[in-house]
Amino acid sequence: MNHFTLRLAVAVLAPLAILQPNIGHCAPTAATSTGEVRMDHISVTEAGKGSPVILIPGLATPRAVWDGVVPELAKNHRVILVQVNGFAGDDPGANLKPGVLDGIVTDLDAYIVKNKLTGAAVVGHSMGGLVGMMLAKAHPGDIGKLMIVDSLPFFAVLRAPPGVEVTPAMVAPQAAVARDKIAATYGKPMSDADAASQTKGLALKPDSITKMKAWAMKADSRVTAEVLYEDLITDLRSDLPSIKAPITVLYPWNSGYPTREMAGPFYRKQYAAAPNVTYVDIGDAAHFVMLDQPDAFLKALTAFAG
């Protein structure tokens, strides 16, 4: 595995080893929002008025990850903030059973239909990007356009040896081991030093790292374990040609790994089969690009939202 692939693997998977239950209340968004709507697999709050923009966070991440963009975005848009049950200290709800990703998609579609949000702009970070692609596949009318933030149609390519075409069947046994190992950490304490070690590489800025660690420590490791497993065995590569909604792939790079020269070709290869895709890169950032470079991310997001 080369250094670029290794760093991406760390960015996507490293938080999963540190997640502990710490049931409490999730932090409010930075803009005035409506009351929370609880569903089987997700909860939703809203802010602002205008054309709808749906924001889906990544693995073990609360809706607060979007705090830096919500106030500006809500000036012209109806911002729908999604949070997966079991993250941010929330009750896991139905997410202790298999089928979490499909359940999230089902809940999102129900919310979109009920609230007449068809054709919304959808933004997903990491796991949220995979969910966005799943939603576009299952309910193409729900999405008018899709922004994918540092995510892939098949996460397991990050674990593939050079020259090997990995498949979900090949990954499933290792993914199951990882799921069971992470789920077994539920209720067990972890030191700050271990948490810092496991989250290394996910963000570059000290403030970003502090926020990320605090969020990760509140996630229910049982939910995270199941979502990790489903992430790793979900392969949407063959579905990309059928996704007609325009896709914007936003990816980070930095002076270490991945460099700009490495990142661009990698992401273009992963999304080559998509019929309508554009690319936006943001430098001096890691996986949590919205935390490392909030101004640049907001600029890219508002340009996407229109």
Predicted regions located by residue number:
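Active-site loop/oxyanion-hole signature of alpha/beta-hydrolase fold enzymes
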Residues: A27, A47, L81-V123, M127
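Conserved loop-alpha-helix segment in the C-terminal half of the alpha/beta-hydrolase fold
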Residues: P246-A285
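Conserved HGGG/HGGXW glycine-rich cap/lid loop of the alpha/beta-hydrolase fold
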Residues: D40, T45-A94
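Alpha/beta-hydrolase fold catalytic core
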Residues: N2-I54, A74-R78, L117-T118, P275-T278, ...
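Conserved alpha/beta-hydrolase catalytic His-Asp/Glu region
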Residues: V157-G163, K181-P241
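Conserved hydrolase catalytic core segment
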Residues: T118-A160
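Catalytic histidine-centered segment of alpha/beta-hydrolase-like enzymes
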Residues: A285-P294, L298
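Flexible "cap/lid" loop of the alpha/beta hydrolase fold
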Residues: L146-T185
